[in-house]
UniProtKB/Swiss-Prot annotation:
Primary localization: nucleus
Protein name as annotated: U1 small nuclear ribonucleoprotein 70 kDa
GO molecular function: U1 snRNA binding
Biased composition (Basic and acidic residues): 93-102, 257-402, 409-427
Expression by tissue: Ubiquitous.
Gene Ontology terms: cellular component: nuclear speck; nucleus; spliceosomal complex
Length: 427
């Protein structure tokens, strides 16, 4: 029921009396039957949801049968292996480690390389090589070349030592790619020797080359590095034992003869380094003596050289007076700037005090001495800025601790002003 006096008129028919709903006869009978069927008044469909489950079916208990007893393992102990039996400690299987596998493969490759070198050595004959033409004593061997270097580039680099007859850049027969070494034939033997001495270690296309003479046709019993040999006796290839067997033990190898210029060059380099070291030591010795010499000796030496110290002190005094003059000049410039600013400020204040009624005359008579001096533009020395410093002043007293100890001591003993004698400086 709504309120009859509701201002919003939410239920305008609130004043009308409610009428009871007319119930049919069938509904009334149905309600009676429901009440008679179950005390809760629920329908049959709802009552089926609350019906209990049927009871469990009865099963008789199982019959108890006799089980066999538990037995131990004592009867099987005799079947175990004893310490003397081979099955007691079986041997561990041998497994190859990765490092051992790599070492085995490396050894196999070395053996194959030695076999191949022995086979190629039988076929090796540099004197009958169709590619090796020209005079062997005028031919220079250049190795460790850049793979992108061309014959024209190599010729341009080595032409500085003399005219070149031919440049042969060795390439692979199958791929036609350069192998990194070449042979240069000069017109004269002296040019080849000059290039052999000076071109070793030269940089060509970013790589330092190795220069040597042609040893295949000039040195007997010599073999290239691919066949187990190398560059004379200074470098030994992979087949070191083979090289030792071929060389006779009673005499030295003939390949040592062309390497003499290189040894001489190394000796000359060592001599040059020794000269440089001796020069450095000669320059350092007087400094070390001056450091190691005690201070008393230096004091006696300075007494003997009094004239030099006086000249040095006079030069320092002149420098100080110049610095003092520059500083005074800067102070005067600052004082003039302050004077102009204060003068303008005083003029403005004077006008204000004139308006106030003559107070300026009373206060103006007591102006400070510094203000008058600034107005007249006098330097600060006359105004008493340095009135404490009378006589010969030492304006660098705060820097004595930053100077060298010896120089400061003798300078102070030589000349002191009255002002510095009255002060106590920290030594």
């Amino acid at each position: 029921m709504g309120d009859s006096g509701d201002p919003f008129l939410r239920n305008p028919n609130a004043a009308v009396q409610a009428r009871a709903k007319v119930q049919n006869r069938a509904n009334v009978l149905q309600l009676k039957l429901m009440g008679q069927s179950h005390p809760t008044g629920l329908t049959n469909n709802l009552l089926k949801l609350f019906e209990p489950r049927p009871p469990l079916e009865y099963k008789p208990p199982p019959e108890k049968r006799k089980c066999p007893p538990y037995t131990g393992m004592a009867q099987f102990v005799s079947n175990f292996a004893e310490p003397g039996d081979p099955e007691y400690a079986p041997p561990k299987p041998e497994v190859e480690l990765p490092s051992q596998k790599r070492e085995r493969i490396h050894k196999l490759r070395l053996e194959k390389g030695v076999e191949k070198a022995a086979e190629d050595l039988k076929k090796y004959d540099p004197n009958n090589d169709p590619n090796a033409t020209g005079d062997p004593y005028k031919t220079l061997f250049v190795s460790r070349l850049n793979y992108e270097s061309s014959e024209s580039k190599i010729k341009r680099e080595f032409e500085s030592y003399g005219p070149i007859k031919r440049v042969h850049l060795v390439t692979d027969q199958l791929t036609n790619k350069p192998k990194g070494y070449a042979f240069i034939e000069y017109m004269h033997t002296r040019d080849m020797k000059a290039a052999y001495k000076q071109a070793d270690g030269q940089k060509i296309d970013g790589r330092r080359v190795l220069v040597d003479v042609e040893r295949g046709r000039t040195v007997p019993n010599w073999r290239p590095r691919r066949l187990g040999g190398g560059l004379g006796t200074s470098r030994v290839g992979g087949g070191e034992e083979i090289v030792g067997e071929q060389q006779p033990q009673g005499r030295t190898s003939q390949s040592e003869e062309p390497s003499r210029p290189r040894e001489e060059r190394e000796k000359s380099r060592e001599k040059g380094k020794e000269r440089e070291r001796s020069r450095e030591l000669s320059h350092e010795q007087p400094r070390e003596r001056s450091r190691d010499r005690p201070r008393e000796d230096k004091h006696h030496r300075d007494r003997d050289q009094g004239g030099r110290d006086r000249d040095r002190d006079s030069r320092r005094d002149r420098d100080r007076t110049r610095d003092r003059g520059d500083r005074d000049r800067r102070d005067r410039d600052r004082g003039r700037d302050r004077t102009s600013r204060d003068h303008d400020r005083d003029r403005s204040r004077k006008k204000e005090r004139d308006y106030e009624g003559g107070e300026y005359e009373h206060e103006g008579g007591g102006r400070s001495r510094e203000r008058d001096a600034e107005y007249r533009g006098e330097p600060e020395e006359t105004r008493g800025y340095y009135e404490d410093d009378q006589g010969d002043t030492d304006r660098y007293s705060h820097r004595y601790d930053k100077m060298e100890e010896d120089d400061f001591r003798y300078e102070r003993e030589y000349k002191r002003s009255k002002r510095s004698e009255s002060r106590e400086y920290v030594r």
